[in-house]
Amino acid sequence: MNLKCLFCGILVGLYVEAIEAVNYTPEKISASISLKVPGNESEKYSLDMRQLKNDRSSYLLEPSKGIPMVITQRMEDMNGKLRINVSLTALEDVYFNFSEQLSTGFNHDDCQFYMPGFWYRRNLRSPKEAPSFHTSDSWLVREDRLSAPLTGIYSEKEKSFVTVSRIDNFANEVLSTHREGEIILSGKTSIGFTGFENQNGVATLSFGFPYREAPKSYIRKLTLAPAVEAFQSLKKGETMLLTWEIMENKADDYSDFIRNAWEYSYDTYAPAPVDTPYSIEDMKEVMSRFFVNSLVTGNSLTFNSGIHLRTADCQSNGQAEVGFIGRVLLNAFNAWEYSWQCGREDLKENSMKVFDSYLKNGFTQAGFFKESVNFDRGYEDPVHSIRRQSEGIYAMLHFLAYEKENGRRHPEWEQKMKNMLDILLQLQHADGSFPRKFHDDFTVVDDSGGSTPSATLPLIMGYKYFKDKRYLASAKRTADYLEKVLISKADYFSSTLDANCEDKEASLYAATATYYLSLITKGDEHRHYADLTRKAAYFALSWYYVWDVPFAQGQMLGDIGLKTRGWGNVSVENNHIDVFVFEFASVLQWLSKEYEEPRFAHFAEVISTSMRQLLPHEGHLCGIAKSGFYPEVVQHTNWDYGKNGKGYYNDIFAPGWTVASLWELLTPGLSLIHISEPTRHSLIS
């Protein structure tokens, strides 16, 4: 279908010489406005669209009965997209909520849905306690939940899609007294709502202003709350202008739809790098304070305390985690490398204490890492995860490769890592996947394959380091699984360990895994892996914000000037932003050159600059008690992990992984060094 067919005659041209005007029929679009008198239930009025006599592109939206408002709507073509401009003028003081619904003409059951960074397909990988089709097939959400204020509907049958995007400068937000029901805002907000609804079997885009959420609002991890509808004041004589843009196009499949939608969002909102005062050297110097001030000694393992810390004091605890949110070994390697570059004997000594303790006491009887140990409780988690184990091997292979390049060898560590890689071969299923969780005796606890790409990285690194082709063959089998089960089905899920749902990390890890394979292959095989990398990368990109969410005065993140562009939403279940990126910016830089696509490189720079903003240091602690302990759970919408709400952090955080992620972001080309073997000097300006 084309734009004219979609709207059955919506005017798409303003001038005869541009595009021939056609008759507009209102059957495909409906509008309504709700007005609220304080202390009373709101009253909803449907709006009939009547074309103005002297302007075939403009309409008067007439209510079903008299209201103290004048509402007009103008349609215009914007480079093949339909721009909807709504003007609301108050004849008396009013509190209003305006909404429109656009029928796509698609059968709802034939469709998959998209709200970037929050909703993919039907969210059926998510639990019923989070937004998904398990609860309803129609959802409206506030725009700041999304990495772009956009909703898209893709018809698998028609191989067509329609999106609606809000166009605004998004400058205002206001604190509200309630989180459910009908609420009157105490000031101005820029946040509207967007979503999709099943209207008598037809997939419909719904959008409006100010925000509204239905059938539920999602206010806390695994907590659905009653619906909410906000009403904004419009004083007598005031006019408010609202703008949305409709795009429709063809797409071969859901992945192609996501690519189209991301490129459109990127071009529409044009995120620019964030101007921050911190150079790479500044960032690393401050974050190195975490390496010093979080070190825990006196147990069988020496480690940087990086999980479940309180933002209020950042006091170390006895919890040591090899990968995931602790990243003990990767932080030890980063500190080790930095110590040689900067002549920091303190860091060198501390890192070697970590390595020596894990070499002596950090392995189970079967040869796995003791990946999660709580010395405060005297407890060692008996369940292993392919993700933590893989991330531990990854860190130590970086250490061994760096040492080898500098003329130093560690034969005991080499043997431990070779043994672990051999163990991975035993864990791998016939389809190429790895179980998500398992015991020391190899019995499977969680057979989900969503974490499989985390194993690809150390397998390829192990192949390069030990010259053992079995590891490369195993890595290629993981890619076969990724292609068949995740990438080709556009179904990225369950990579993270603190949620079981659609998540950013699954697509990011898939892109990184196939990127590694493309680096060590040639010809058609190289191109195949590169194509898979690009396809997965678009999904990962869709989680990262291309716009700046507004905050209210009094919300700390807004008061210190946080720009959200370049930060990534986490998952459906965990609706906050964070700095999980690791090597992904390097993947984007590589893709940009590989496919001559400047958007990738430009957005990598947006990510790199934006994620420096919350560096805690003296005079600019950003709500964190200690310098260098980078924040984690950054709450940018009406949701929290358990405490504090929008504009603040959760009270507990894990700087172990945030510091490790930013360190890799600021050390570009890390995998290229140890796989394709150019020097680090050639990769860093």
Q: What would you call each of these model-derived segments?
A:
Residues 257-294, 343-361, 405-425, 467-484, ...:
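Extended, well-ordered alpha-helical scaffold segments
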Residues 329-345, 391-409, 454-469, 509-525, ...:
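Well-ordered alpha-helical scaffold segments within catalytic/enzyme domains
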Residues 7-18:
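Hydrophobic h-region of N-terminal signal peptides that target proteins for export
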